[in-house]
């Protein structure tokens, strides 16, 4: 016989960004709890609103499955004393299992007999097991938590109610000083407290009080309502996924509506309007059929359509205040001088341990010039890089960016163009922030990419130099994101800039404002980001082998990892890698600076390998280079089959080791083959 279980936790208003992850976490923790406690079920589903987290288990068994476990104890010779009686070791073993020596039996394992006991545990009633549901709720973790009243505990928000129903039967439990019942709260303004009749009636009972418990249903309602407005008004609406996910977790009963604003505000840059609506007011942007921004917006009310016109007017009034600010800053910022703003950056702190923004820009300018050479930019591009690096942070002191910090770089580009800066310079000012997320947009221009690299490199090196190094999940200055951006830009543009040599060169630079330190840690940090970018689809041993190669060119590292991963599926992979691994291991015994002497070769297999090594010039794609190396496998095998490398003759031994070392030198640019696993 099965029943349905409902658990609802009523809370004060949750931050929108934690609602969905918390629902998912509750479902996962409940599933783990039921599995660990041997309670089977048919399905499990989550519910969430800004004021509740809930989980419903369908078809829950009314009793645990019985448990039968075998336990292996000491060997028979230890379990029995000289008189054939059970020893203290045997007695202690069974006592620890809650059994007696009468339960002991002996079983043979690999030719020797051992003590075994079998323990049977009858399944408990589901109601008894579910008494531990508060432990499931207590196990949830949140990015923030709070204390309330005089309680000693903390949680994401104060708890107001707890419901635990098994079909229609309430289980009496306590969590954070709240006793369970069947009362849930309806909509804050439209609904009332309501009694949940049963686990099955949960959604219907809440719906009667203007609460849509299913986040998926709220999302579908919002989309359908927006699409209906689109059709009626003949407009297009940008349904941004992130905004949609935020809005659906701000409301319990969604009603979408369209508002408007004075078309005069369309003269403000579109990015300002979109930021005001989307980021600050959580409004959806409206466009005409040609994609042009319209003086309208769509918002979602937490309630029904009653008095909707008043709600629309209120939202329009709030937005106009934002747009007035935007219009003012747009007008006033154009009166400012870029050079004056840049000069003032000397008084803006980049970080108290690192110095000013102006000092950061000075270092970035030097790095950018160096990178422009390394990346092979034209003279015109180098000139654009130099000018962009000289001014690229000026918009931080504009009124617009002060009010809308999301527009850093974007407004810099616009103001730069208005003052006559070259398009390449203006674009680089915007692009230097890219990518601004793990999968975010990359710079499109070489000038912008070089400036972005330089800015991120100085940021990384500066923070490391003053000891502000990320540890664990703690990364307050987003250095992992910056480094991931460095790796992605290098890969995207295919620039063959050896990172180890680049970092060496940067550490040789001299600045009055800062001395770069912790070089080894920086390189390890960059390696970790390259490893992450390779992805878990690439086997760990391949990632490690490639990262241990002698060539640290990011695009090539990524390509070689993919080539090796593909090759690992071929029959030729194992023998080739094993041959090369043997070469690597022996080559470690080679004496430095020993020249290969052909007159010391004693057989044709040595000569054949020497000829192959001498003529080996890796070229082409990573896949083609790997094929060149793997093609040496038969020659290497013949050499080992017919040649004693570690011969007693020291001169011949050193010569053979030198030959192997030369081979390693040529192929280790691909990977450290001795780190590859062929088992």
Swiss-Prot record:
Instruction: Give the matching SUPFAM superfamilies.
Output: HD-domain/PDEase-like
Q: Which Pfam families match?
A: tRNA_synt_2f (PF02092)
Main site of residence? Answer: cytoplasm
Give the UniProt entry's GO cellular component terms: cytosol
Here the disulfide bonds are none
GO terms under biological process:
glycyl-tRNA aminoacylation
Q: Which reaction(s) are listed as its catalytic activity?
A: tRNA(Gly) + glycine + ATP = glycyl-tRNA(Gly) + AMP + diphosphate
- The enzyme class is ligase
Localization, UniProt: Cytoplasm
Family statement: Belongs to the class-II aminoacyl-tRNA synthetase family.
- Describe its assembly: Tetramer of two alpha and two beta subunits.
| Official protein name in the record | Glycine--tRNA ligase beta subunit
């Amino acid at each position: 016989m099965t029943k349905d279980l409902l658990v609802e936790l009523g809370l004060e208003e949750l931050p929108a960004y934690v609602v969905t992850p918390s629902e998912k976490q509750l479902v996962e923790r409940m599933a783990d709890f039921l599995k660990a406690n041997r309670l089977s079920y048919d399905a499990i589903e989550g519910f969430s609103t800004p004021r509740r987290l809930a989980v419903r288990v369908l078809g829950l068994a009314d009793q645990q499955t019985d448990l039968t476990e075998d336990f292996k104890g000491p060997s028979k010779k230890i379990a029995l004393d000289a008189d054939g009686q059970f020893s203290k070791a045997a007695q202690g073993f069974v006592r620890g299992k809650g059994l007696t020596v009468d339960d002991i039996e002996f079983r043979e394992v690999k030719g020797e007999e051992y003590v075994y006991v079998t323990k049977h545990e009858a399944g408990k009633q589901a109601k008894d097991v579910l008494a531990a549901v508060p432990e499931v709720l207590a196990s949830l973790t949140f990015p923030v938590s709070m204390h309330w009243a005089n309680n000693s505990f903390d949680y994401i928000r104060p708890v107001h109610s707890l419901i635990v129903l098994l079909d229609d039967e309430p289980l009496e439990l306590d969590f954070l000083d709240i006793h369970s019942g069947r009362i849930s709260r309806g909509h804050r303004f439209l609904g009332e407290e309501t009694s949940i009749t049963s686990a099955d009636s949960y959604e219907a009972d809440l719906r009667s009080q203007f609460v849509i418990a299913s986040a998926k249903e709220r999302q579908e309602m919002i989309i359908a309502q927006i699409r209906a407005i689109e059709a009626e008004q003949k407009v297009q609406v940008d349904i941004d996924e992130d905004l949609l996910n935020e809005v659906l977790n701000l409301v319990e009963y969604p009603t979408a509506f369209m508002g408007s604003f004075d078309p005069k505000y369309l003269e403000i840059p579109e990015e300002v309007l979109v930021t005001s609506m989307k980021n600050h007011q959580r409004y959806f942007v409206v466009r005409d059929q040609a994609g042009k921004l319209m003086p309208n917006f769509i918002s979602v009310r937490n309630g029904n359509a009653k008095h909707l016109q008043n709600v629309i007017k209120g939202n329009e009034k709030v937005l106009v205040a934002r747009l007035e600010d935007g219009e003012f800053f747009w007008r006033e910022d154009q009166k400012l001088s870029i050079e004056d703003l840049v000069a003032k950056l000397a008084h803006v702190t980049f970080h108290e341990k690192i110095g000013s923004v102006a000092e950061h820009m000075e270092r970035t300018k030097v790095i950018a010039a160096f990178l422009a050479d390394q990346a092979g930019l034209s003279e015109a591009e180098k000139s654009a890089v130099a000018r962009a690096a000289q001014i690229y942070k000026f918009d931080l002191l504009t009124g617009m960016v002060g009010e809308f910090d999301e527009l850093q770089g974007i407004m810099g580009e616009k103001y730069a163009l208005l003052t006559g800066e070259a398009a390449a310079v203006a674009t680089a000012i915007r692009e230097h922030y890219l990518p601004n997320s793990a999968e975010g947009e990359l710079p499109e221009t070489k000038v912008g990419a070089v400036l972005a690299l330089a800015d991120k490199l100085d940021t990384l090196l500066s923070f490391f130099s003053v000891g502000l190094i990320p540890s664990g999940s703690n990364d307050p200055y987003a250095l992992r994101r910056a480094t991931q951006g460095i790796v992605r830009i290098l890969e995207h543009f295919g620039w063959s800039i050896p990172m180890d040599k680049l970092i060496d060169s940067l550490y040789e630079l001299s600045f009055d404002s800062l001395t770069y330190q912790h070089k080894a840690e920086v390189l390890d940090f960059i390696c970790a980001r390259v490893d992450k970018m390779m992805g878990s689809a690439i086997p760990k041993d391949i990632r490690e082998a490639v990262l241990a190669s002698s060539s640290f060119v990011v695009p090539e590292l990524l390509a070689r990892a993919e080539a090796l991963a593909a090759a690992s599926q071929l029959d030729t992979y194992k023998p080739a890698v094993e041959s090369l691994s043997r070469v690597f291991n022996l080559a470690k015994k080679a004496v430095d600076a020993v020249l290969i002497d052909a007159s010391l070769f004693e057989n044709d297999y040595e000569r054949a390998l020497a000829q192959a090594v001498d003529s080996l010039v890796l070229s082409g794609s990573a896949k083609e280079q790997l094929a060149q190396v793997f093609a040496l496998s038969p020659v290497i095998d013949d050499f080992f089959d017919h040649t004693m490398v570690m011969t007693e003759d020291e001169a011949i031994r050193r010569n053979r080791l030198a030959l192997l070392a030369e081979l390693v030198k040529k192929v280790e640019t691909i990977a450290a083959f001795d780190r590859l696993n062929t088992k």
